[in-house]
Amino acid sequence: MFEATTILGYRGEFNNKKFALIGGDGQVTLGNCVVKANATKIRSLYHNQVLSGFAGSTADAFSLFDMFERILESKKGDLFKSVVDFSKEWRKDKYLRRLEAMMIVLNLDHIFILSGTGDVLEAEDNKIAAIGSGGNYALSAARALDCFAHLEPKKLVEESLKIAGDLCIYTNTNIKILEL
C-alpha cells in the first residue's frame, strides 16, 4: 500500500536553537515501474510554521493535505489541536477512512504521524518519525546518526534518506528537504 516513498521528519535542538526538518525522496512507483524520479512529497503549511510530508496514494494524500491545512488554519497554527481535530473528522467520514495515505506533520515543538485509519501517533522520542516503504531504514539511520554522529540536522536527514534510498527499491536518492 505505501510502496512508493520515504519521508523523514526530524525536530529538536542543535547549538541551542530549535529546528524542524522534513525530507523525502522523489520516486513515484506504479506497480513495478518507476514513473517519476523527482516528485515533491513534502510541503510547508501555515505561514511556514508547519512541515508535512506524505506516503501512499497521491490523490488521497492531496485530499488529506487540503483537509489538514483547513483545520490547521481554523486552529491558527496550533499543531496539537489540529491533529486531534483532524483525527476526529477523519474517523467520522467513511470516505476518508478508506484513503491509502499517511502523513508526517511537525513544527518546532511536536512531530506526529497521521495514519491511514485516522490514528495520530506522536513520535516515541518526539524527535524523529518516518513513513513509507523506506521509513524503517531512514528511521534507524536517523536514530543512530542522532545518537552518535552529531551532524547538523539537515545533513542528518539527507544521509538518513540516502541510506534508505540505497536499501529500498521504492525509494531513490533524489532528496528534497524543507526546514523551519
From Swiss-Prot:
Pfam families from the UniProt entry: Proteasome
Stated name of the protein: ATP-dependent protease subunit HslV
EC number, as in UniProt: 3.4.25.2
Main localization category: cytoplasm
Entry-linked HAMAP family: HslV
Activity regulation remarks: Allosterically activated by HslU binding.
Function: Protease subunit of a proteasome-like degradation complex believed to be a general protein degrading machinery.
Catalytically driven reaction(s): ATP-dependent cleavage of peptide bonds with broad specificity
Protein family per UniProt: Belongs to the peptidase T1B family. HslV subfamily.
Species classification: Bacteria, Pseudomonadati, Campylobacterota, Epsilonproteobacteria, Campylobacterales
Biological source species: Helicobacter acinonychis (strain Sheeba)
Catalytic residues (UniProt): 5
UniProt cross-references to InterPro entries, sorted A to Z: ATP-dep_Prtase_HsIV_su, Ntn_hydrolases_N, Proteasome_sua/b, Proteasome_suB-type
Assembly, per entry: A double ring-shaped homohexamer of HslV is capped on each side by a ring-shaped HslU homohexamer. The assembly of the HslU/HslV complex is dependent on binding of ATP.
GO CC list: HslUV protease complex; proteasome core complex
Alphabetic keyword roster: Allosteric enzyme, Cytoplasm, Hydrolase, Metal-binding, Protease, Sodium, Stress response, Threonine protease
Subcellular location: Cytoplasm
NCBIfam families tied to this protein: ATP_dep_HslV, PRK05456.1
Any one GO MF annotation of this record: threonine-type endopeptidase activity
PANTHER family (UniProt xref): ATP-DEPENDENT PROTEASE SUBUNIT HSLV (PTHR32194:SF0), METALLOPROTEASE TLDD (PTHR32194)
